Each structure stands twice: as structure tokens, then as C-alpha cells.
Regions:
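Short acidic-glycine-tyrosine-enriched beta hairpin
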Residues: 55-72
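Amphipathic, hydrophobic secondary-structure cores in small proteins
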Residues: 32, 37, 53-55, 63
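Ligand-binding loop in jelly-roll beta-barrel domains
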Residues: 71-97
Length: 97
């Protein structure tokens, strides 16, 4: 797989209706316990490895892998001995009246 550079990933995500794109860098052996976000995510792992648990299943992700999370989905994250970096395209929840 040809991994795009960040600017290309960002431009593609914004063209597909995402609101923002962020680079997330996690230190070695860190964890993010079960939580939710007020946005949906389409992400690309670019360095290291991580484990993402949602809907009762855990996925092992390495550089080049993608993952998606819908708005407010409970999930947990765990990062490998070298940490991990991923690019996350975020789509915020529509405003309510």
C-alpha cells in the first residue's frame, strides 16, 4: 500500500466532508481506557502499532492499517512498545436546534 503524506490525507478527508484532520502521537505502552468522542473518525496508522477494542472485538493495527469509529462509539486503545502515530479525520456531530 502506498501511504499518502499528511497533506494528501488531509486534503482527501476534507474533500470527503470531514471537518478536521489531526495527527495523534501516543507514547510507548500507553493506554486510553474505554471512552467515546463527539465525532466520527476515519484514521490511518502511520507508525508503530496499536490495539483498538470496540463492539466486543479487538483489532491489532500496524502502519498502513485503517480504522473507522462512528460518533459516540465506546472504545479503548492500547499502544505498543514503540508507541503509535495515526492521522485521524474527524466528522463532528450535526448541530441540534
Amino acid at each position: 500500500m502506498n501511504t499518502p503524506d499528511f497533506k494528501t490525507f488531509e486534503a482527501t478527508a476534507l474533500a470527503h466532508g470531514f471537518d478536521e484532520v489531526a495527527e495523534r502521537v501516543w507514547p510507548a505502552n500507553s493506554e486510553a481506557p474505554t471512552h467515546t468522542h463527539p465525532f466520527s473518525v476515519d484514521a490511518l496508522v502511520v507508525l508503530g502499532e496499536m490495539w483498538l477494542t470496540s463492539h466486543g472485538a479487538t483489532r491489532h493495527l500496524v502502519a498502513g492499517d485503517t480504522f473507522q469509529l462512528e460518533l459516540a462509539v465506546e472504545h479503548a486503545e492500547r499502544y505498543g512498545p514503540e508507541g503509535a502515530t495515526y492521522w485521524a479525520a474527524r466528522r463532528k456531530a450535526p448541530a441540534t436546534a
